């Protein structure tokens, strides 16, 4: 059953996750998904438990139109499927004709965008907002409205634009930090004002870009300020420096804010790798939550701590996100980690012999070689047979 906005009251600590991997994520240069690939990713996202899937921008191409329609036909009974649309009737009609019942309308509200891109006055933009939202509502759509470049919009005009959208019937207001120029303190204050302005009936959403590496931090600040929905992409893919990362935002909401989502967190690693395979964009080695080194340890002090109690050097367990703990060998290794790795191979040595093996491992590593468990095993066996 698709969850509606009415299930998420202002007092609720359950936050909606709006995934835009298939729209904003795919806008990254070099990512061009086929309709079948988009459907496969959408199935994974629905199974993961996101609340909203932005399937595409139906008016932008025939392929986007078909993909949006097919995704809705496949999973529209499991999750809210939404399509992006400019604030004009042609785009709205195209989006409606896909069969979906939710639309994400946007128009820029910053002076910069209005002057150089839209070449429209404030009055013209406000008229577009009212007419497009009302038109979509008159056609029975759930409407989420985004004042594009909201964080660089003059405050009084931003609030006028938001009020105009709500008066026309908008159900949700999304606040995009379009080029990632916010920091958490400012974004918190901004979202707090907007939440208080719109009241409990309207869901406020956050949409953060990563141009200064703050997309996750800003998203969490916005949620902490009262936003009840966060826009994310798997692995943080997207234009320029990318978007707020689904896995980081979800785990931040859960572990740092102590709020809930409907996401099955133990599937995060699996979905991350699936999207990486489909898009051809690898997951960074040091990526938080789902990177291969997110739960990797080499330092002897750290490994000893993790062996005794993993939470000494891990804020969450790898199993909680479907990832794996990796104990590595190198010049920083200690005897406790070496003992554990060898015992997992069925090799048991005295402390004196472990020290000899450890010295050989460090010598190997300091020569610029990557030391594997197999190397340690061979050194140990050679010592045992000597």
UniProtKB/Swiss-Prot annotation:
The keyword Metal-binding applies. Residues 15-269 form the Pyruvate carboxyltransferase domain. Coiled coil: none annotated. InterPro entries: 2-IPM_HCS-like, AIPM/Hcit_synth_CS, Aldolase_TIM, IPMS, LEU1_arch, LeuA/HCS_post-cat, PYR_CT. A divalent metal cation binds at residues 24, 207, 209, 243. One of its GO terms (biological process) is L-leucine biosynthetic process. Its EC number is 2.3.3.13. Keywords: Amino-acid biosynthesis, Branched-chain amino acid biosynthesis, Leucine biosynthesis, Metal-binding, Transferase. It is an enzyme of class 2 (transferase). Its cofactor is a divalent metal cation. It catalyses: 3-methyl-2-oxobutanoate + acetyl-CoA + H2O = (2S)-2-isopropylmalate + CoA + H(+). One of its GO terms (molecular function) is metal ion binding. Pathway: Amino-acid biosynthesis; L-leucine biosynthesis; L-leucine from 3-methyl-2-oxobutanoate: step 1/4. Homodimer. Catalyzes the condensation of the acetyl group of acetyl-CoA with 3-methyl-2-oxobutanoate (2-oxoisovalerate) to form 3-carboxy-3-hydroxy-4-methylpentanoate (2-isopropylmalate). Carries out the first step of the leucine biosynthesis pathway. NCBIfam families: IPMS_Sufob, LEU1_arch. Belongs to the alpha-IPM synthase/homocitrate synthase family. This is 2-isopropylmalate synthase. It comes from Saccharolobus solfataricus (strain ATCC 35092 / DSM 1617 / JCM 11322 / P2) (Sulfolobus solfataricus). The gene is leuA.
């Amino acid at each position: 059953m698709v969850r509606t906005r009415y299930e998420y009251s202002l007092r609720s600590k359950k936050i909606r996750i709006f995934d835009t991997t298939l729209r904003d994520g795919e806008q990254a240069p070099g990512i061009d998904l086929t309709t079948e690939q988009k459907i496969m990713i959408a199935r994974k996202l629905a199974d993961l438990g996101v609340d909203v899937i932005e399937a595409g921008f139906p008016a932008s191409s025939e392929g986007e139109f078909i993909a949006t329609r097919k995704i809705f036909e496949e999973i529209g009974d499991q999750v809210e499927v939404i399509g992006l649309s400019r604030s004009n009737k042609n785009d709205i009609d195209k989006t409606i004709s896909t069969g979906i019942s939710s639309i994400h309308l946007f128009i820029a509200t910053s002076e910069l965008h209005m002057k150089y891109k839209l070449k429209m006055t404030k009055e013209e933009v406000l008229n577009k907002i009212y007419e497009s939202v009302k038109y979509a509502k008159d056609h029975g759509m759930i409407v989420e409205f985004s004042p594009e470049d909201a964080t660089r919009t003059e405050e009084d005009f931003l609030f006028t634009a938001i009020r105009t959208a709500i008066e026309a019937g908008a159900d949700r207001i999304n606040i995009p930090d379009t080029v990632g120029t916010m920091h958490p303190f400012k974004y918190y204050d901004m979202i707090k004002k907007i939440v208080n302005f719109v009241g409990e009936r309207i869901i406020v959403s956050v949409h953060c870009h990563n141009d200064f590496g703050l997309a996750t931090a800003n998203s969490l600040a916005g949620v902490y300020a009262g936003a009840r929905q966060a826009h994310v992409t798997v692995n943080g893919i997207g234009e320029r420096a990318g978007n707020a990362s689904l896995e980081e935002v979800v785990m931040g909401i859960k572990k740092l804010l102590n709020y809930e989502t409907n996401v099955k967190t133990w599937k995060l690693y699996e979905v991350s790798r699936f999207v990486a395979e489909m898009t051809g964009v690898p997951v960074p080695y040091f990526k938080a939550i789902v990177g291969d080194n997110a739960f990797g340890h080499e330092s002897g002090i750290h490994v000893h701590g993790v062996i005794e109690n993993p939470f000494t050097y891990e804020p969450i367990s790898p199993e909680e996100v479907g990832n794996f703990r990796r104990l590595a060998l190198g010049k920083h290794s200690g005897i406790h980690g070496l003992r554990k790795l060898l015992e997992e191979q069925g090799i048991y040595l005295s402390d004196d012999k472990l020290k000899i093996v450890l010295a050989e491992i460090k010598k190997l590593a300091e020569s610029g070689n990557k030391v594997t468990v197999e190397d340690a095993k061979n050194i140990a066996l050679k010592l045992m047979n000597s």
